[in-house]
Amino acid sequence: MLVSPYAILLDGESGSVLASKTGDEKIFPASMVKVMTVLTAIRSISDLDATTTMSADFYDELYAQDASRAGFEPGEEAKLRDLLYGALLPSGAECCMQLAIEAAGSEDAFVELMNQNALDMGLVQTHFTNATGLHSAEK
């Protein structure tokens, strides 16, 4: 029994759709965006053991949106690899933002990389508007 309102089953070899339940409907991806954020960061950052200083620039917005955080604080030193874990395990929005800055210089530039990765993977109906998965009117 399938409980989810959305599902798609693909043939692993051919990529053809075997079954779909509202598979073409646009949905809000929420924290699933973080999977693409981490994938894009891994592809874009050459030294994941390098350290970074958590920028204070985005925290007010994350607090205002009640975003999930991993617990890294502004000004804290963190290894990029730890930010990858922080983005996925506790769904840390601050980790996603810092990875975006480290990988592309800004969230907007990073989102362009995310969208290019999606196209490269054949995800032609997928469009990202931010690195965190927080609600965006653009979907």
Regions found by a protein language model. Give the residues of each.
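Active-site-adjacent loops and short helices of periplasmic peptidoglycan-processing enzymes
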Residues: M1-K139
